[in-house]
Amino acid sequence: MNRAVATCCIFLLLSAFLCDQVMSKGGRGGARGSARGTARGGRTSRARGSPAVRVAGAAAAGAAVALGAGGWYASAQRRPDDSSERGDDYYSNRTNWELYLARTSGATVHDSTITRLSALLLPINYMMHFAP
């Protein structure tokens, strides 16, 4: 699975998890159309899952996509063992000091303005969403 597709699926499922139908309903509150019941001429409503069940399903699907993407990333990082002889490091996980030093020596900190801006706007968004 492509990393961009996995990220898109995660954001799609998170938006389904965070956006409830009540919050996204436009217009005035109250029942409209067939939700009024049969006494006013509406159709009988079909059985739907409760919001808690739908939210739990969306959360489970998001967790499954996240675990799948994590497993894909971990398998992509693994290197095949191409040595013909099996020495002392056959049962090791290749975390000797030289490998660690080679992987971390070129590491740089990426602190862009977008990261700082999102770190500032995310709590404000949460406060506006959950404010009474």
Swiss-Prot record:
Glycans are attached at residue 93. It comes from the Eukaryota. A lipid is attached at residue 107 (GPI-anchor amidated alanine). Residues 26-50 are annotated as: Disordered. Mainly expressed in brain. Also expressed in embryo and retina. Its main location: membrane. Coiled coil: none annotated. Keywords: Amyloid, Cell membrane, Glycoprotein, GPI-anchor, Lipoprotein, Membrane, Prion, Signal. It is found in: Cell membrane. It is a lipid-anchor; GPI-anchor. Residues 1-24 form the signal peptide. Residues 33-50 have a biased composition (Low complexity). One of its GO terms (cellular component) is side of membrane. Residues 108-132 form a propeptide. Belongs to the SPRN family. Prion-like protein that has PrP(C)-like neuroprotective activity. This is Shadow of prion protein. The lineage of its organism: Eukaryota, Metazoa, Chordata, Craniata, Vertebrata. The gene is sprn.
